[in-house]
Regions:
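Short, low-complexity, polar/charged sequence segments that are solvent-exposed and flexible
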Residues: 22-23, 61-65, 108-111, 134, ...
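Active-site neighborhood of glycoside hydrolase catalytic domains
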Residues: 13-104
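Active-site-adjacent substrate/metal-binding segments within catalytic domains
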Residues: 1-10, 20-42, 169-183
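Aromatic-lined substrate-binding rim segments of carbohydrate-active enzymes
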Residues: 1-20, 86, 102-124
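Substrate-binding clefts and catalytic carboxylate motifs of secreted carbohydrate-active enzymes
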Residues: 78-81, 97-100, 115-183
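Hydrophobic faces of well-ordered beta-strands that scaffold small-molecule active sites
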Residues: 2-5, 45, 90-91, 133-135
Length: 183
């Protein structure tokens, strides 16, 4: 089953008339392109935006919360009702159903749980929770040797703290964190 996100994540957008026309057309194009796939179970408005907008992490203008609600709780449902009314729509992930109502509530909707990776908790921490639906969680790993061989042929560069490995790591301190957990 496919949980299909619209391509919005980790940011806020100013909803100008031009931007609205642009995203409406993008929604229509993608809905028409994907709606007939038998595995499509759900459309999701965005990734992690409801949670961070509610927390005030990204909001810099008072209109951004209004624009958020308009985009994900009015425009997308409106377009879906015309082009794919039979596929379920979820406004964000994580969410408890929208309107900034406790977006990461473990008892309603879906949850993103990153306390092991970002919070340096032990793996046993996962056993403490019984989320209704954990749609995102995880722990980073080192790439396979086969993948690493596409960027270096020097065996010394396969060390997690080598120049090549550090330059390909996109999470500050990530290689050290992985090594610590491996001890």
């Amino acid at each position: 089953m496919v949980w299909q996100d619209f391509m919005f994540a980790c940011s806020v957008y100013e909803l100008t008339p031009e931007f609205e026309a642009n995203i409406r057309q993008e929604f229509i194009d993608n809905i028409k392109r994907l709606r007939h796939h038998a595995s499509l179970a759900l459309w999701c408005g965005n990734n992690e935006m409801e949670m961070f907008v509610k927390q005030g992490t990204w909001v810099t203008k008072p209109t951004e919360m209004r624009d958020y609600l308009f985009m994900y709780e009015r425009i997308i449902p409106e377009v879906l009702s015309e082009y794919d009314p039979d596929t379920f729509y979820w406004p964000a992930s994580p969410s408890s159903g929208g309107s900034f109502d406790e977006p990461n509530d473990p008892n309603r909707g879906d949850v993103h749980y990153w306390e092991v990776w970002h919070g340096n908790k032990p793996f046993s921490e996962y056993r403490k929770y019984f989320f209704r639906y954990a749609s995102e969680f995880g722990f980073q790993s080192f790439p396979s040797v086969k993948t690493l061989e596409t960027v270096t042929d020097d065996p010394k560069e396969l060390n997690p703290f080598s120049y090549v490995m550090e330059k390909h790591q996109r999470n500050y301190g990530g290689n050290g964190k992985i090594a610590k957990y491996m001890q």
